[in-house]
Amino acid sequence: MAKLITSFLLLTILFTFVCLTMSKEAEYHPESYGPGSLKSYQCGGQCTRRCSNTKYHKPCMFFCQKCCAKCLCVPPGTYGNKQVCPCYNNWKTQQGGPKCP
């Protein structure tokens, strides 16, 4: 019985450690985003990430790459968080809607 309890405690501690490690890796790092945080050759990969969950992949990629080339910034995540990249957030269409996905 003691071996069972010890094994359970060790597994619980190991599981907790793994969860904490994974959550630290997934944290938002502001120094990785923001105006000028990217080089122009990095836009393709960042836009692929940004547009990964949309059903309108081609237009998303087109406008994301256009915005990234101008702003050198792509917000974190696949949606929202545009406040991190002011240029990306403030570029509007003629109708006043957002130009950047």
From Swiss-Prot:
One of its GO terms (biological process) is response to fructose. InterPro entries: GASA. Six disulfide bonds may be present. Keywords: Disulfide bond, Gibberellin signaling pathway, Secreted, Signal. Residues 1-23 form the signal peptide. It is found in: Secreted. It comes from the Eukaryota. One of its GO terms (cellular component) is extracellular region. Belongs to the GASA family. Gibberellin-regulated protein that may function in hormonal controlled steps of development such as seed germination, flowering and seed maturation. This is Gibberellin-regulated protein 6. It comes from Arabidopsis thaliana. The gene is GASA6.
